Amino acid sequence: MSTNQQESDGATRVAYILGMPLAENVVRQWPQMGEIVRTSRLVADVEGNFPELTLEVGRRLQLDDVVVVEWTCDYGDGRLYRNVTIGELEDGQAVRVTDYWGEPTVTPEWRQPLTDRLDMPGDGIWPNREHLSHY
């Protein structure tokens, strides 16, 4: 996290990720941390603490009032986080957003003979570092 928080202009990365605007009263939650943030302004304020973050969307699926997005980010430390964001929609705006991600890990030795490597081309669903941008 940056100690030099940037002032938010109200735009959010999560709106880019979802491909649609956030409702003013949006609720964004991170279950793995047990956190929730309310309002688009506070979402933007939280995001402003990570100016080094780069990201790109790999796949976005929309079904009626739900959008599910697979995306990749780098917080500036060189590690690629693979994420899933679910947006619940009303009137073309996201009213509830749930983000899931975990730190990158290595396959445990015991599991290696049981699994194959996931094909992850750099310009595919899980972009590599060269395909990430600032938003």
Predicted regions and their residues:
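C-terminal and inter-domain tail/linker signature
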Residues: M1-Y135
